[in-house]
């Protein structure tokens, strides 16, 4: 596979603002972007008045990204050898504001009960694009939120996609952040959804980070199962740690968990870190996708259970992604923090 993500040649810091807050949005001209950044495999356009960019590599695998909110709305890799062997990986819901997909979240870690993402409504701009013989495509977005300069890099390869988050603190004081990259994955059936690779890992029931693209709010994610047919998650209480004892964790029941080392363990010189990757299992389609975390200390896994049909769709969905929620990230003045997520497969 091509070089995963390049963190070099990042945008220079913008003017420092006095607090962590999101600026006003501006109009994005896709025609100008196409002239400046468009190239083979990278196409800028508008869809329903929403500025978009589509990445498509040589084997036909594609990705669609909403430019105004840095929201990945579609990832359709080639997973079968037949001519039309493409499958949508992401679960999205259209509307005034699209939900689901893949999105980045950054919450002010100094707020004890969480809060909204500091980049909600952020003024994103395209900084650069790059390609390698259309077998590796990349687009770089950036925005400023208070004292933070934020760079978001989305990359596409023949059998994988990657999103990378780079946060620079231009303020005079340290900042505490709870970052995450959340993916809403599509499954054909509720009964055929699962993950493998987390056996032996500690986990704790916990609500997800709140975001504009969430399908279930943090309170909905923690709500007990409404139907008795598939059991109840009432036994899982926030703050109570357990160890995953299953080779395959079934996701038909409702759950909202953080997989990672307990905060107290992380104070020790040596402790067990969670696996850097695990696989999703979609038995209905016979597909497997590998979720990889880089730079983050935790993995979130949430399944809707009986609330799966909230949006009236035929497919089941699961929310997962790398995060640093239980132990926030401290970024000193002038310092930079980096994290990334990769979705890859070997279904071919």
Curated annotation (Swiss-Prot):
Its biological purpose: NDH shuttles electrons from NAD(P)H:plastoquinone, via FMN and iron-sulfur (Fe-S) centers, to quinones in the photosynthetic chain and possibly in a chloroplast respiratory chain. The immediate electron acceptor for the enzyme in this species is believed to be plastoquinone. Couples the redox reaction to proton translocation, and thus conserves the redox energy in a proton gradient.
GO cellular component, one term: chloroplast thylakoid
Compartments reported by the entry: Plastid, Chloroplast thylakoid membrane
Main location: plastid
Gene Ontology BP term (one): photosynthetic electron transport in photosystem I
Residue interval of the organelle targeting sequence: 1-17
Protein's membrane topology: Peripheral membrane protein
Phenotypic effect of disruption: Malfunction of the NDH complex. H(2)O(2) accumulation in Dark-Light transition.
Recorded superkingdom: Eukaryota
One GO MF term attached to the UniProt entry: catalytic activity
SUPFAM superfamilies, per the entry: Galactose mutarotase-like
Keywords: Chloroplast, Membrane, Plastid, Thylakoid, Transit peptide, Transport
Subunit structure: Part of the chloroplast NDH complex, composed of a mixture of chloroplast and nucleus encoded subunits. Component of the NDH subcomplex B, at least composed of PnsB1, PnsB2, PnsB3, PnsB4 and PnsB5.
Protein name as annotated: Photosynthetic NDH subunit of subcomplex B 2, chloroplastic
